[in-house]
From Swiss-Prot:
GO CC terms, sorted: mitochondrial small ribosomal subunit
MF GO annotations: structural constituent of ribosome
Family (UniProt): Belongs to the universal ribosomal protein uS14 family.
SUPFAM superfamilies assigned to the protein according to its UniProt record, in alphabetical order: Glucocorticoid receptor-like (DNA-binding domain)
Keyword annotations of the record: Mitochondrion, Ribonucleoprotein, Ribosomal protein
Taxonomic path: Eukaryota, Fungi, Dikarya, Ascomycota, Pezizomycotina
Gene encoding the protein: mrp2
Subunit structure: Component of the mitochondrial small ribosomal subunit (mt-SSU). Mature N.crassa 74S mitochondrial ribosomes consist of a small (37S) and a large (54S) subunit. The 37S small subunit contains a 16S ribosomal RNA (16S mt-rRNA) and 32 different proteins. The 54S large subunit contains a 23S rRNA (23S mt-rRNA) and 42 different proteins.
Organism: Neurospora crassa (strain ATCC 24698 / 74-OR23-1A / CBS 708.71 / DSM 1257 / FGSC 987)
PANTHER family given in the database record: 30S RIBOSOMAL PROTEIN S14, SMALL RIBOSOMAL SUBUNIT PROTEIN US14M
Keyword Signal: no
Protein name per its UniProtKB record: Small ribosomal subunit protein uS14m
Biological processes per GO annotation: translation
Function: Component of the mitochondrial ribosome (mitoribosome), a dedicated translation machinery responsible for the synthesis of mitochondrial genome-encoded proteins, including at least some of the essential transmembrane subunits of the mitochondrial respiratory chain. The mitoribosomes are attached to the mitochondrial inner membrane and translation products are cotranslationally integrated into the membrane.
């Protein structure tokens, strides 16, 4: 019965349904990005016939929503939260502060002047 078991994902962070959904969105976007870029180029190329551009527009709109880059949301690698994320460290503000105070983040220390 192990063939029906879900595949193990090596996300390396806290896992809940939202994190799993975000992971699948990132995979779908990565696979479909070259096709989306090609279709967008065809749509914006005014030297091509209008019918070709319209067909490309239709194909682009029929692609799955998860292939859009706006569907991807930055999430904390420690807690899975999606708000208050520091982009450079991929952590929420609170987790960043706690890790910085404990000295777990190299090159970061509390400011004093």
């Amino acid at each position: 019965m192990s063939m029906f078991r879900a595949k193990k994902l090596d996300l390396g962070c806290f896992t809940n349904v939202r994190v799993l959904r975000d992971h699948s969105k990132r995979k779908a976007f990565l696979e479909a990005e070259p096709e989306r870029q090609a279709l967008r180029y065809v749509i914006r190329n005014t030297t091509l016939p209008a019918r070709t551009r319209a067909v490309a527009q239709l194909q682009l709109t029929q692609m799955h929503a998860y292939t859009r880059p706006t569907q991807i949301r930055n999430r904390c690698i420690l807690g899975g939260k999606s708000r208050g994320i520091l982009r450079d460290f991929k952590m929420t503000r609170y987790n960043f502060r706690m890790n910085a105070l404990m000295g777990n983040i190299p090159g970061v220390k509390k400011a004093s002047w």
